[in-house]
Amino acid sequence: KYIGADVDVPAGDIGTGGREIGYMYGQYKRLTGLYEGVLTGKGLTFGGSLARTQATGYGLVYMLDEMLKHNGKEIAGKTVLVSGSGNVAIYAVEKAQQYGAKVVAMSDSNGYIYDADGIKLDVVKEIKEVRRGRIKEYADAVPTAVYTEGKGIWTIPCDIALPCATQNELNLDDAKALLANGCFAVAEGANMPSTREARSEEHTS
């Protein structure tokens, strides 16, 4: 009654991955007898998309690349901050690094890591995708990294900021800090990560 191909198509998010979507899809089929496009993020055996895990993070960086080209800039050689450490953040980092960016920070709900030498994504993937650990474990594994508790990732000097964690994570003070520290581009990977005041500050600066 409340979900359907022409009603509402739920997707995974924080704490809800392919397994949980699979459970929901199985129950939907049991109740309706229908095999249709009603949930995104399903496994391939249930009709899911091959690159679903990477799609949002990769797409964010593709969009960023076009945005910068339009303004006579490029991703290569730029210093980047990425909030979050889930699928969107991990694959935004991966694609940004492929484009030649230096990603120096990532975060989770407890704090953030800063690695002046650039984030070692294989270490992050091991921690987050294999061990399901916390981002602070990165600092234990990488001597050049520093872990800081709390929300302070946007105070780090950068060229580009990619908020990929959660809604309203980037507020007015964060926007002012980014601009004061040389950030010239903000591209959003999460759903509405910037507050209205932050967006206004970014657009008028």
Q: Where do the language-model regions lie?
A:
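N-terminal ligand-binding/catalytic initiation module
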Residues: 1-50
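Short, surface-exposed connector motifs at secondary-structure boundaries
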Residues: 5-6, 73-77, 156-159, 177-185
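Short catalytic-loop micro-motif centered on adjacent basic/acidic residues
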Residues: 10, 81-82, 160-163, 185-188
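N-terminal glycine-rich phosphate-binding loop for ADP-containing cofactors
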Residues: 16, 44-54, 182, 199-200, ...
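Flexible loop/turn segments at secondary-structure boundaries
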Residues: 17, 46, 88-90, 111-115, ...
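Conserved helix-loop functional segments at active or binding sites
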Residues: 30, 65-73, 152, 167, ...
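Glycine-rich phosphate/diphosphate-binding loop of Rossmann-like nucleotide-binding domains
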Residues: 40-43, 48-155
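Rossmann-fold NAD(P)-binding glycine/threonine-rich loop
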Residues: 165-205
